[in-house]
């Protein structure tokens, strides 16, 4: 049996955080909560901390700390309240913590995820930006500090499970022997069948209505545009040392097959399961053993059929832009992610039309390509380029 794990759940009030706490609560003999963090929902954070007995909570500023203290209704002593990004990174690296669930959405989660890797933690990676914006830095930190890296995105977790047993290295430097290509599946989101000409009038509520998964608003929009899948292609490149030409995307509307690995002999291994994030979370927490997740049985007779099709890049230009960014290099991936975060925020606030999300990304990628050559050798380099890309996106007049 693996050692008892004390988990820091970064981004605990989101959907991944909820699912993580659900799995942890099912295994009190093996798992406990060391720390929680949240950005805005202090009432929920207080309730979570009281329920799981967290020793530490991390909030963004003093105002949030005051709201947390006012919301505290726990019978036990209030947890230590830490404030700010530096406290978040220090908590992720704390010696009392063995495992970090990196589930903060966006580039804001990057420093803490990197700190966890540098401290040699088991990192359950649900934050895409750690690899999209800083893949080389992050993977080097994993290798150099003996960290364990377990992907939590359902697609990458599926690929991880389908890889050769001896090839599940924490940070490979070359593709696994015998693996021909990776096949990432995508539901196609709510607009899979919609005429591209009609997408101009899409509302935030429509874009957030994912047909299969329960997710936060930002990632739901990313799923609708398939930018989310593009980010996952970039992640797969770093996680499995796989070149872009050996990574393919398939639309699979049922979301039962979570991804596949094709081998040189023609064999294809697929991981199937319910569209429930507790499955990959339990896998990451229990690895190399299996933990009960609370997910029900998969009844394939209920589905009757499983469909697959090629993505329409006219309907999903963000996917094509993501492949282009990966081929262009790490600075382009930083710009891609920054532009998307700015554009999606503007869309959700009603300041940007849905179809202009891709336009903003394309404009920022064109801007980045014209910049002087950039070498990203530190987190500060990444964050500087991220800030400049966000500034350019925000000044386009579209956002």
Curated annotation (Swiss-Prot):
Task: List the residue ranges forming a coiled coil, or say none.
Answer: none
Q: Which family does it belong to?
A: Belongs to the DXR family.
Q: Which organism is it from?
A: Bordetella pertussis (strain Tohama I / ATCC BAA-589 / NCTC 13251)
> In terms of domain of life, where is this protein from?
Bacteria
Q: What is this protein called?
A: 1-deoxy-D-xylulose 5-phosphate reductoisomerase
Q: What class of enzyme is it?
A: oxidoreductase
Described by its record, this protein's role is as follows: Catalyzes the NADPH-dependent rearrangement and reduction of 1-deoxy-D-xylulose-5-phosphate (DXP) to 2-C-methyl-D-erythritol 4-phosphate (MEP).
On whether Protein transport is a keyword of this UniProt record, the answer is no
GO MF terms here are: 1-deoxy-D-xylulose-5-phosphate reductoisomerase activity; manganese ion binding; NADPH binding
Gene name, Swiss-Prot/TrEMBL: dxr
